[in-house]
Amino acid sequence: YLKAVCFDGEVAEMEEGMDTIVGNGGIRLSGGQAQRLALARTLCHKRPVLILDDPFSALDRKTEEEVFANLRKLTADGIVILLSHRLYLFPQMNQVLWMEDGKVTAGTHEQILEKCPEYARLYEAQAGSDGSREHAPQTPGDHKAADKEEKPEERRD
């Protein structure tokens, strides 16, 4: 699982390798290292539903994309609910939930772009901020995405 979260190389370089103590009495991990270690630990315990709250927030984009691709492979037979403020991965999701003020709009990334002007605005702003406007292809799996800044329509709870 360390390889899946792109942490195996760094662990191999640690003086004690896999036996390295981290935290109290051990070495201090960076935010990205700690986040990847936590995700690896989570992946060790296979569950049919996995809920991840911004699991890539401390990762650089290249590492995030690699970890996300590996995560999709490892969880292809399950459901992943990914909460994130970074929308560029959402075109790869089978289902996107956009929430705001107690209202939920569900659909594919393209459907949410059409239904929710605020989602479209935020997505375009983020896509433009890194110079990339590429949309990733839709791929199979029951992965779902829910954005923290979220937007309206359809259901009210």
Predicted regions and their residues:
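H-loop (His-switch) and adjacent beta-strand-loop-beta switch element
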Residues: 93-110
